[in-house]
Amino acid sequence: MVSMEEKIKACVLQALESAAGTKGEGVYLVSVRVKGAGKQTKIEILLDSDTGIRIDQCSFFSRRIRELLENEGGTPVLDGEDFDLMVSSPGLGEPLLMPRQYLRHTGRLLRVIWKDEQQSEKTVTGRLQQVLKTEGEITAVRLVPVKTGKKSAGNVQEPIELMLDCIVRAVPEAEL
């Protein structure tokens, strides 16, 4: 049996595919979250693009996704249920969930938790210097660690390379 989340994801992917040649071209799905049930159902859809998603693109997809959810092929995905739909971009503090999101964050500060060879979790805050590809696939990132605090001035760190499959969580950090 197909879960409600999978049905919603299928509708989102259909909306994205049908956006070719429109202002929605180049937008991709980051995540779908369904919270609550019945009249309390909240659907949160995060979309992004390689250049960042605009508000008008979010509203465009919100309308299209709602139409599909309410009447997909004559059969509503959410059969007569009330639901709140939120379509937005991943905000600051949202973890990077897809490899292609790293490309857009090149040059930005990230807080990364990864596992070393002994499977111990390590944490580093660093500037994403480069996204590394193997055979066209994003496989690793190069970070330049930064020290925070008063004693960090003039302290240059060596870049580190982290394989994507070792990264547990990577979150863009605010720079003040």
From Swiss-Prot:
Function: Required for maturation of 30S ribosomal subunits.
GO BP terms, alphabetized: ribosomal small subunit biogenesis
Alphabetized Gene3D superfamilies for the sequence: RimP-like superfamily, N-terminal
GO CC term, one of those recorded: cytoplasm
InterPro entries (UniProt xref): Ribosome_maturation_RimP, RimP_N, RimP_N_sf
Protein origin, superkingdom: Bacteria
Entries under Pfam families matching the protein: RimP_N
Family to which this protein belongs: Belongs to the RimP family.
Cell compartment(s), UniProt: Cytoplasm
Full protein name: Ribosome maturation factor RimP
Keywords, in A-Z order: Cytoplasm, Ribosome biogenesis
PANTHER family the UniProt entry points to: RIBOSOME MATURATION FACTOR RIMP
UniProt keyword Protein biosynthesis, yes or no: no
